[in-house]
Amino acid sequence: GAKLARGMADVIDPARLAVIANTGDDIEIYGAHVSPDPDLVSFWLADLIDERGWGLREDTFAVMDGLRELGHDVWFNLGDRDLAWCLERSRMSSEEELGPTAALARLNEAIGVRAHVLPMSEDPVRTWIATTAGWRPFQEYMIRQRAEGIIEGLEFRGAEQARPSAEVLAAIQSAHTIVIGPSNPLASIAPILAVPGIREALIAAPAPVLAVSPVVGGEVLKGPTAAFMAFAALECSADGVADFYGELLDGIVADENVARLPALQTGTRMDDAAARALLAEQVLGFAEALAR
């Protein structure tokens, strides 16, 4: 999803772009509040993303090295500048009483991001995964457990009590086009949809709602998306993605044909800036055609 957001920012005025990001992966660690999904979007939009696909380019890891020397079990690797970013978020929360949305807006202003990166809620929601090893928070499952084991359960703890921020609802209601990015439907998008009011806002929105399939050439390029879809008894294909989103969608963009709803069949790999911009333009063109 972050790559496509960057492509969108390259073909439209970034100030017109709002990205609603999952906070179910958030974690409190090293005395800081780490918010991986919103930060990933921000770093992509600022052209600061490292070639590994996470963290800041040319970041150093002196703090992690220092913690190891002190006997700390460092299982979540965070660069020095990345940690500074997260510590500043925590400071703004505790000292200035800023919520996640306002704090991230302040951080993004400092790195020149003009798009609106919006945490899905001001309230805490955490994704937990169950395998044969028991229940784990998302980051522990992904990193410490290396996403090993068959997924037996998925919970978005706190979602029922959470509410979408005013900024999220306003972005949905005022959008000309709504795109669900090619992220893991179960792990990255479902936590957003689990916040009461967001699914309903998407259904009621006047703009067309499209999804870009994360399945490319019959495979998932990144992460354990296939394992999550298997847990939900979904086919790992664009049809499976369409089945998961159901009534939310007016159309889907994929590199394979989808029979159940209007589809744009095109290449969806985003290996470079040109490919990201091309896909963004195609998605927007498809949305415009659907809106007629």
Report residues per predicted region.
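A short, Lys/Arg-enriched amphipathic alpha-helix followed by its capping loop at the start of a domain
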Residues: 3-16
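A short helix->loop->beta-strand "cap" motif at the edges of active sites that frequently abuts
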Residues: 13-15, 205-209
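Electropositive, gly/pro-rich neighborhoods at or near active sites that engage anionic ligands
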Residues: 22-156
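Active-site glycine-rich loop that binds ribose-phosphate moieties when present
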Residues: 152-172
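An anion/phosphate-binding loop that grips the pyrophosphate of nucleotide cofactors and donors
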Residues: 175-176
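Charged helix-capping and loop-helix junction motifs
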Residues: 191-200
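Short connector loops at secondary-structure junctions
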Residues: 212-224
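C-terminal functional extensions of proteins
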Residues: 221-292
